[in-house]
């Protein structure tokens, strides 16, 4: 009677999943980028201590946005948060090294267009040309596959690049 008559069932318990980890990491990286832009102005000017501080703050802010009572509800989740901070420190270090090795500079973060959002757009101005690079943050291990692109199975980055190019052309109509 309780199950069929009243429709009672066991309460579902929330469990922090891989998708949640990806969402929090993504939000933390977004917050980190805005902090750098606002407070330091340039990724390459950050000291290692500042970079670690920004990562720590960004993760904590992203967790608060997500509902920190849930994320700190178990030892497992607390461990995942520590792991997430370490992973983001390595990610930010690698992204900084990539910027240092080239002439591209971040131009836009969380760039919204039609029905999507580009995580980051980097640009490099060279004379009368502007080169554009699209960065899509992923926590998984998916890699770019030219064959899948050719067969229309992996179009997201191409759509993002087209949108970024159109937006940059509006910014730099003379180039």
Where are these regions (language model features)?
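C-terminal, charged and often intrinsically disordered regions of DNA end-processing helicases
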Residues: 1-31, 35
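Non-catalytic protein-protein interaction segments used by genome-maintenance enzymes to assemble
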Residues: 106-168
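A non-catalytic, helix-rich entry segment at domain boundaries
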Residues: 28-113
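Short, polar/flexible loop-turn hinges at active-site or ligand-entry regions and domain interfaces
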Residues: 8-16, 38-44, 169-171
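Short, charged/polar micro-motifs that form catalytic or ligand-binding hotspots
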Residues: 11-22, 74, 78, 146-151
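Short acidic (Asp/Glu) and glycine-rich catalytic loops that position anionic groups and cofactors
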Residues: 2-9, 37-38, 61-72, 135-143
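Short, well-ordered alpha-helical packing segments
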Residues: 2-3, 26-33, 85, 89-92, ...
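Short helix-terminating capping/connector loops at secondary-structure junctions
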Residues: 101-104, 170-175
């Amino acid at each position: 009677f309780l199950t069929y008559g009243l429709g009672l069932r066991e309460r579902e318990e929330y469990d922090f999943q891989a998708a949640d980890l990806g969402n929090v990491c993504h939000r933390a990286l977004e917050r980190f980028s805005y902090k750098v832009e606002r407070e330091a102005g340039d990724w390459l000017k950050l000291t290692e201590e500042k970079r670690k501080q920004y990562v720590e703050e960004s993760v904590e802010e992203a967790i608060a946005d997500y509902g920190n009572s849930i994320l700190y509800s178990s030892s497992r989740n607390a461990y995942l948060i520590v792991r997430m901070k370490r992973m983001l420190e390595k990610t930010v270090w690698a992204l900084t090294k990539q910027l240092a090795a080239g002439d591209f500079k971040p131009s836009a973060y969380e760039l919204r267009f039609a029905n999507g959002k580009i995580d980051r757009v980097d640009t490099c101005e060279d004379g009368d040309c502007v080169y554009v690079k699209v960065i899509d943050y992923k926590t998984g291990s998916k890699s770019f596959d030219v064959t899948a692109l050719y067969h229309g199975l992996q179009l997201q980055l191409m759509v993002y690049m087209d949108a970024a190019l159109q937006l940059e052309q509006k910014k730099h109509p003379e180039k």
